[in-house]
Amino acid sequence: MAKSQNKESYNKIFTKLKEHHKWFENSIPLIASENIPSPAVREAIISDFGNRYAEGWPGDRVYAGCIYIDDVEVECMKLAKKLYKAKFADVRPISGVVANLAVYSAYSNPGDVMIAPSIPAGGHISHGKREHSGTAGLVHGLEIEFYPFNAEDMTIDVDKTKQKVKELKKNNRLPKMAMFGGSLFLFPHPVKELSDFLKTYDIHINYDAAHVAGLIAGGKFQDPMREGADTMTMSTHKTLFGPQGGLVLGSEEHEEPIKKATFPGLTSSHHINNMAGKAVAFAEALEFGKDYAAQVIKNAKIFAEALNDVGFKVLGESRGY
């Protein structure tokens, strides 16, 4: 009798999983958007929470059977707020892109203008133009303007940005939102230097902390929400060592707009098992985050210097990497 093709495929999947695990056990991945969660986080991820649905907000669910899910989600929000010194946290977004979309949906309309870093300047595709298939433009219909950028210093030009915003206002293209953060940046963005200016034009400021969330949590980078950002979005699995997922932070005034944007706007049920994993990761970051973030930066600088010494051109040399 010929072997079942279904059985062959089934076995192949587990063979490939074993090969993958063996490969990565003997590798040092250098992909900035990846990290390894702790055994405790992984235990939460494989819990029965992954089989359940929980639309809505703790205490106000569409589904029954959410007693313990609600307890964990409330704890998760408490930990997120404590970790980032925020008054409000929505832990339901299933990715950093969905977190960004929640802010777009809450604080702008299709056709509004957002100013953001361009992709060559380190911006993320979720901040991008429609013609580049960027999430902000393609999905939410935002018109995107880019910050003037000093490539040599790897920084947004503050004076030129102020001038550009004034010119955009004259041309009836005043931004509704300003996005800081990105997917390739080594140094803090000038939130503090620009926030007062932007707020004189009633521009909502969001900081996409996806790649630096763990460094911010550990107090080793900038502190965007103390520097003037209204909201902060992130994924939870890069320098923050959690599961794949997203997070939106803000103050009390942002609670209702963000909650409505997340549900029912962008998600029905969220990934509840990953939410539990986020809670564990937030607790771990509160306990170990400062030392972890310091070691991440130390490792990166030493590695950059070593690469530079053997002839690689490494970004950020003039600023100490």
State each model region's role.
Residues 37, 68, 95-96, 274, ...:
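Short, conserved alpha-helical segments within structured domains
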Residues 71, 75-311:
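Conserved PLP-enzyme active-site core in the AAT-like
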Residues 300-301, 317-321:
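Conserved glycine-rich beta-strand-loop-beta hairpin in the small C-terminal domain of fold type I
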